[in-house]
Amino acid sequence: MTSCVLAGSIETTPKVSPGDSEAKPLIFTFVPTLRRLPTHIQLADTSKFLVKIPEEPTDKNPETVNRFEYSDHMTFSCESKEERDQRILDYPSEVSGKNSQRKEFNTKEPQGMQKGDLFKAEYVFIVDSDGEDEATCRQGEQGPPGATGNIATRPKSLAISSSLASDVVRPKVRGVDVKVSSHPEIPHGIAPQQKHGQLTSPTTSEQLAHKPPAFSFVSPTNQKTPPVPAKVSGTTVLEEFHIRRLDVHGASEEETATYFHTTAHDSPLPAWKGASTLVFSPSAQLPGSSLCGSNVADHTRGLAPEAQKKVSTSSALNPREDVRTSPSPASGASLRSPSASYIPVRIVMHSLSPSPKPLTSSSHGSLSTVCSQTSSSGNLSKSGLKSPVPSRLSLLTAILKSNPSHQRPLSPASCPTFSLNSLASSTLTLDQKIKQTPSTPKKSLSSCSLTTGSTEQEQASAESHQPCHLSFFSKTTPLSQAQPPSPPALASSSYAATDTEKIPGSTLRSSTTPPQSQTDLFSLADVPSVTPGLSPLSSSKGRKDGDLRAPEKNRNICTRPSTLSFIPPINESTALSSSGKCFHPSPALSDLIDRSKRTCSQRHSDQRPNPSALPTPPVSRAGSASHPHLGYSILPPESSLTQALQRSPSALHPSCGSATCPSRTGMPDSTASNRSSRVSTPSLPVSLTRTKELISPCALSMSAGPENKKPKQYKTKSSYKAFAAIPTNTLLLEQKALDEPARTESNSKASVSDLPVELCFPAQLRQQTEELCATIDKVLQDSLSMHSSDSPSRPSQTMLGSETIKTPTTHPRAAGRETKYANLSSSSSTTSESQLTKPGVIRPVPIKSKLFLKKEEEVYEPNPFSKYLEDSSGLFSEQDMAIPHKPVSLHPLYQSKLYPPAKSLLRPQTLSHADCLTPGPFSHLSSFSLRDEQEKSPTLLSQDTYNKPGHPMVTIPEHDTLDSKE
């Protein structure tokens, strides 16, 4: 459907029932293996290209249809197009129960053709022939009105083909399966489309056999699409989606995208072009062999006879291309194409996207699987990532707002926010970590990635590359973070992952062969990949990669600028409005791809020289138009990135190889193999190290360094109340992660001086972080105020104000409720320690008490309840005060009766009065204490209540303990 929309003219209604296709003369362009055949091939041409389908096609073995199948199809492309058309016409009736017939078809070319295998021959030709020719053929096929009906069925076949197609084989499979399987498969696709797809290409089956899992998954998705009549077009779409799915989920998401594309491409030739482009892109991504190249070439051919599929994709399938480039293509197709099936695919990807790509494999799980950075990616969201994060700044803001939850993912309160925020937080953490880990320039780049990257990543996630990048970034993001020494390699790896998926096998191979070429291709691929899905993660990771390369800033920037140049256009067209989920304009994507290629070429030519000049304009244009954040982020690093690419295209590629391999199911293997040689061992180790950094909040906090300390304490205090039940270690790590934003704020000013453009974004990001921190404080205070209102005592509110002022002193206490209680008990009496242990005090009470003592002393004077404190103990009162602050942070999560710090301050009194209330039923103690204390002062009551909610399980006992100690 998208193809149709893009093409603008649909010769045949995209959704044509098999009967319709029969009624209309089937004008399918069967492109022989030779790509040089005209884009539109008449029935007569089909005779040349009709391909016999081997008997080998098995219904269950979509993978069976593979490159081998393509060869067979090419060999059998003797049948005339008329025969094919006849078969196509016949096929609709036979579709329902033609699974066996499909096989027969494979065996009997003429009969099969009539029965529905007709399409098979077409596909075969396309696959074997050069990608461009094949694409052209596909366009021709799609053009025929008759083909529309077949197309409807075809999507499933295509999906199967896609699923069958393996990494390297997949591109071919797409081309062949789409072409060959398209006609025959579609007929069967109506009823047994999946089988038909398998059948469709006995040869295709062989190819698919290479990668049965990925394509097999796609097959079901394709079944949805069959209604869409785009035979060839549908096939193309199917391929595209499948690839994406493979990239993101492994195969599921990618496949769906391909399938949808198939449906979308049921439109006329123009649609075919779009479809071809999409297909070839996936082909480029997956194909690692000449066959892949051919398939991609065929697709490209349909789009345009451009040697490079990326360029061809961008020109013909601009909107599609964008979508195709990333999961977004599938999403874009779904959004753009009338057929609803497209949308579902997109939704799936986006689910990952928050996934951003990086989160799919690892981050996705994270992006949590943001995916889940999956966004995603995380992307993760994984996922994700990852509904898509609107923008890096937005993501950061959201993360900061949910910082306490991010800091305390384990705490029940944080869990609710963790799902969305978790993804964002993960992404943010990764991004921030990267910022902090690398030098200031690197950090700046990171910040830029955080905001722009988030969006772009989400875009990438949305695009077909989202899956790849989610996977890739999941694995690669950690890798990139893990590779402080050679950040460029990682950035390149992300590019490579995207590029591998995106660029046709032949192109990929070609680019892979020369490190520089590969780098360029990777960069191209990466851009879409970054742009797509795990906006937060993928893009962040991409940016991070850039930042990581910040040390190798020149090189890093070189890669980034090209990547950014590609991404910005995508962002401009589609992603600008959206955070990067669906908004992936094909034209923008095409521009990005072309630009990326151009940039890559420039880099290659000017690897030593500064190619940033050429890449810069695209980057500036794309970055600034698409994302202000991106714009400034990209511009400053551009020269650096260019240099970075120049410096270590090889390193980038190695990273790519490592990351890509995990990223893609199939292509990673072939691509990884190709890149593996290039992969530098240092890159991988660095990647691993970086991954740890990225993953662990500790790493983030470490990165933050001294800057984080002050904000860190404050944040720790806020979030620790919520984390009271969480183990101290986890709390510490999360605390560090939270500190990261604070450090970012501090660094933003420093970064501003370091990199004007990069700093602009980081400064904004940090500023936003600061705002978020302020918001957090506000939320805590507001929650305290709310609780005070709920609480009978006004002093609590007053206390809240004073507590807010004293908050900094409470920071040490923020370590955890258990810590807070331990400190209080230490101040009050040794007995408290044993009782405090009940809540789960992990840290030694003495340490906490020391910290609390110092802070409490400081806070004592301002405390409105100083008289109460004097009654029980100044330190204890202040500790209580500190405690309420923690609950303030906790309150949003628990939202139970949390009383302002004033209550805590009153608490010392309560403890003295409640001494008689020895620990009994905790709830009883709390109630009793509240009554007595309430009589004494409303603040006391509120204090008790506040503590209860703060620590639902142990809070009351702790209060009781404190009281008894008092």
Curated annotation (Swiss-Prot):
Cell location = Nucleus; Nucleus envelope; Nucleus, PML body; Cytoplasm, Cytosol
Q: Where is this region: Required for interaction with ISL1?
A: 144-810
Biological role? Required for myoblast differentiation into myotubes, possibly acting as a transcriptional regulator of the myogenic program. Required for cardiac adaptation to stress through integrated regulation of the AKT/mTOR pathways and FOXO1. Regulates cardiac homeostasis and plays a role in the protection against cardiac hypertrophy. Binds chromatin. May act as a transcriptional cofactor for ISL1, repressing its transcriptional activity. May also repress MYOCD transcriptional activity.
Give start-end positions of Low complexity composition bias: 354-387, 437-455, 478-497, 785-797, 825-834
Note the topology in the membrane. Answer: Peripheral membrane protein
State which tissues express it: Expressed in cardiomyoctes. Expression is highly reduced in hypertrophic cardiomyocytes.
Give all Phosphoserine modified positions.
129, 486, 791
A cellular component term, taken from the record's GO annotations: nuclear lumen
User: What organism does this protein naturally occur in?
Assistant: Rattus norvegicus
Pfam families recorded = MLIP
Which residues does the annotated region (Disordered) include?
132-154, 182-207, 303-337, 354-388, 434-562, 597-684, 785-837, 929-966
Q: Where is the composition biased (Polar residues)?
A: 195-207, 325-337, 507-521, 639-649, 657-684, 798-810, 937-946
Q: What is this protein called?
A: Muscular LMNA-interacting protein
Renumbered to this chain, the Basic and acidic residues biased-composition regions fall at: 542-555, 597-607, 957-966
Q: How does it assemble?
A: Directly interacts with LMNA. Interacts with ISL1 (via N-terminal domain); the interaction represses ISL1 transactivator activity. Interactions of ISL1 with MLIP1 and GCN5/KAT2A may be mutually exclusive.
- Source domain of life is Eukaryota
Against PANTHER family, the record matches this protein to: MUSCULAR LMNA-INTERACTING PROTEIN (PTHR31514:SF1), MUSCULAR LMNA-INTERACTING PROTEIN MLIP (PTHR31514)
Molecular-function annotations in GO: lamin binding; transcription corepressor activity
Picking any one GO biological process from the record gives: negative regulation of cardiac muscle hypertrophy
Q: Which UniProt keywords apply?
A: Cell membrane, Cytoplasm, Membrane, Nucleus, Phosphoprotein
